[in-house]
């Protein structure tokens, strides 16, 4: 008798991250699942797609999680806080993309592409996991690929963070600010609490929900947790950029021994990482949106005439762009696949 399809509930289906996750699920190993899209009242009734079928986003009801195998929380932290116990009590396995469950007892932080320590892996008792921040995953993935060839000693990174990290409202406000500045109109500041268009900012003040320094703390902490043992230290600053989508990172790398740029590129290349050899062909963050892999440009920093002559150096600049929403969705699906391998199958004989 064929196994019945998995039942999946996507909470926060109307959010930007929820939409990206819905799209990625439709082309993943979970494509045949019975997918239910739910959200709070603000997103009710919106027409969207679940796989190849049109559907409406439904309201979260007391029985929304009954018989559910997996629940993805892709909306706000508040939405997760309100409903995750309901999903847990219903017996669903949970993947949290909002970060609300980080630190909860028995809820590990996961980045399956880079975490290979069996002691840290989910077990049969694991019912919920937090999907790691995409930038923590991205940096840990580069370190993992580099391995013994690159032997990285330290990373210094600057992240240019897009408005889409903060949802529809932030995108709309950035758009309106851009238009209003060009027409000399007052700026809406409900989300950012200050000007975000045509400027780079490290802070919008304590009243703003947009806190680049807070993002830096989350990413640094999660990188330390998911990166392999012995990984290089990370110094990170986050700058809010006047862009809609896509991460861009400038990363300075120091190695333990000199390498040529092409040798480092070969070491870093691998699953989910595409090395772009020519700067003229390197995509910006706009073109990186919808790319399956992060795009990486490797540039040597020659310390002296000797290293320039040998074309080998211990210091490099990496310029990296990636689709922030797609990367987050892909990691969440990898988390679910990890939990699915532990799911009991069949009946008692």
PLM region spans:
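Charged docking surfaces used in two-component/phosphorelay signaling
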Residues: 71, 163-349
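N-terminal Rossmann-like NAD(P) cofactor-binding subdomain of oxidoreductases
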Residues: 1-194, 231-233, 284-290, 296-297, ...
């Amino acid at each position: 008798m064929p196994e019945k399809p998995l039942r999946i509930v996507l909470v926060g289906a109307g959010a930007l991250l929820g939409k990206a996750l819905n799209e990625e699920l439709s082309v993943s190993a979970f494509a045949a699942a019975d997918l239910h899209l739910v959200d709070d009242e603000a997103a009710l009734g919106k027409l969207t797609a679940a796989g190849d079928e049109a559907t409406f986003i439904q309201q979260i009801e007391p029985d929304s999680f009954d018989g559910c195998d997996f629940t993805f929380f892709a909306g706000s932290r508040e939405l997760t806080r309100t409903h995750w116990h309901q999903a847990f009590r219903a017996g669903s396995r949970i993947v949290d993309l909002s970060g609300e469950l980080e630190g909860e007892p028995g809820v590990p932080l996961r980045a399956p592409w880079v975490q290979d320590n069996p002691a840290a892996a989910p077990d049969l008792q694991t019912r919920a996991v937090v999907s790691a921040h995409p930038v923590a995953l991205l940096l840990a993935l580069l370190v993992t690929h580099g391995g013994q060839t690159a032997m990285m000693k330290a990373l210094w990174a600057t992240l240019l963070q897009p408005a889409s990290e903060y949802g529809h409202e932030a995108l709309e406000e950035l758009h309106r600010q851009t238009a209003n500045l060009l027409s000399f109109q007052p700026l809406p500041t409900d989300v950012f609490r200050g000007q975000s268009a045509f400027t780079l900012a490290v802070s919008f003040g304590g009243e703003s929900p947009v806190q680049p320094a807070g993002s830096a703390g989350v990413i640094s902490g999660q990188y330390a947790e998911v990166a392999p043992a012995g990984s290089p230290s990370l110094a990170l600053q986050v700058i809010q950029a006047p862009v809609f989508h896509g991460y861009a990172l400038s990363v300075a790398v120091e190695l333990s021994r000199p390498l040529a740029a092409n040798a480092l590129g070969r070491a870093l290349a691998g699953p989910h990482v595409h090395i772009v050899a020519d700067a003229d062909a390197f995509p910006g963050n706009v073109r990186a949106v919808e790319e399956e892999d992060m795009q990486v440009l490797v540039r040597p920093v020659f310390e002296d005439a000797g290293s320039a002559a040998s074309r080998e150096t211990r210091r490099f600049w990496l310029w990296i762009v990636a689709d922030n929403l797609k990367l987050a969705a892909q990691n969440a699906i990898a988390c679910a696949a990890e939990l699915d391998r532990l799911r009991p199958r069949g009946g008692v004989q």
